[in-house]
């Protein structure tokens, strides 16, 4: 449990954590940070050191209260009017799960939405919505964001790890264990030398170099 304790402390202190799912799934390592602590410099680190897609994961309960749907469900609805879409919709990914993608958003005060400061603003504002979801979060969401945007929202499975073992659920479980606002930024770590995902061994080297906790999915499942 030491690795989990270190990861929880890092998240509470506004630092990064690395999460490896498993060799039997994506076999990828994601860079993870609590949305409430995100700053523009953190976005820069994620896009340069990790290099994958910067996404914001939120729990299924909050997504439901915001009337957010999974992207494949939205596309299914749209395909009634655009039949060609039905052939493109991916309900099951190659690694065996339904994708957790929902819509993309920008905060209304952003310009293009893609800059480090714009993305950090969008993420922090969405974290604020999640923190007051039972007060005026739903109203704030519709007033303060526009879509499409540059932050990809991910919706966690309703039963979290009982239902799905992706980085979305793993990071949400860890953020819940840390008693932080239930919104977490995740980004896949890529390898520019191999053009593939960064191996666990290389992620471990990075972890030690920058003193960032690296945890396995099995450790999170045992919380």
Can you describe what each PLM-predicted range is?
Residues 1-223:
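Catalytic domains of riboflavin
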């Amino acid at each position: 449990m030491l690795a989990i304790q270190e990861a929880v402390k890092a998240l509470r202190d506004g630092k990064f954590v690395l999460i490896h799912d498993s060799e039997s799934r994506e076999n990828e390592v994601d860079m993870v940070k609590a949305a409430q602590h995100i700053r523009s410099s953190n976005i820069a680190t994620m896009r340069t050191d990790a290099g994958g897609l910067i996404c914001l994961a939120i729990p299924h309960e909050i997504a439901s209260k915001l009337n957010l749907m999974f992207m494949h469900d939205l596309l299914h609805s749209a395909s009634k009017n655009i039949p060609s879409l039905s052939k493109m919709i991916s309900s099951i990914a190659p690694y065996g799960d339904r994708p957790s993608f929902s819509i993309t958003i920008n905060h209304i005060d952003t310009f293009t939405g893609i800059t480090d400061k714009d993305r950090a603003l969008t993420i922090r504002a969405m974290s604020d919505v999640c923190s007051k979801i039972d007060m005026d979060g739903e109203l704030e969401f519709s007033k303060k964001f526009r879509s499409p945007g540059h932050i990809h929202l991910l919706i966690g499975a309703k039963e979290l790890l009982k239902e799905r073992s992706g980085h979305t659920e793993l990071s949400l479980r860890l953020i819940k264990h840390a008693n932080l606002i239930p919104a977490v930024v995740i980004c896949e770590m890529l390898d520019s030398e191999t053009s593939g995902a960064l191996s666990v061994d290389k992620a471990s080297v990075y972890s030690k170099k920058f003193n960032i906790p690296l945890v396995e999915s099995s450790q999170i499942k045992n919380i």
